[in-house]
Amino acid sequence: KSKDWKVKPELLHGDGFQDAIVLIFGKPRTAIFAHMDNIGYAVSYKKNLVRIGGPRGESGWKLVGSDSKGEIECTLKVQWLWAAGNKKEELKYRFKRNIDRGTPLIFKPNFRETEKTVQTPYLDNRLGVWNALQVAENLENGIIVFSTYEEVGGGSVQFLAKYMSSLHIAQFG
């Protein structure tokens, strides 16, 4: 809960920030980066899916997302086809309607918690964000960056690091 944070940060986001979020606390001397994107699939033509990142999935696994028509919870369908003696993987989705092309679909979270462990697919991204938010509670002088596009497009970290460098020199140097 941000209302319990020791210092209220300046929030940078929106146009020009490549869907990233930057929190600036006090006079920054350090930075934490956590990426927010997930691996999964993008919807293509004829219910086909294209990989985003390096997901491994099996038929029957649940995928979630949203498009212009609403929320989506669909099922992954993995088929192996033989063409000219070569085995080829075909990825499709099962859903009651067509999903807008380009819509990202990620694995439905499946958190399993015991007294000693938490398990869910692709936990690294989620833990990075959670850890950064825990640090935010007591951070007085630093920057927390929630970056994007690490799974596709080369990521936003290089752009954000350059921006932070110019910001640091301009405001805090």
Give residue ranges: language-model regions.
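N-terminal hydrophobic/helix-forming segments and targeting peptides
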Residues: 1-173
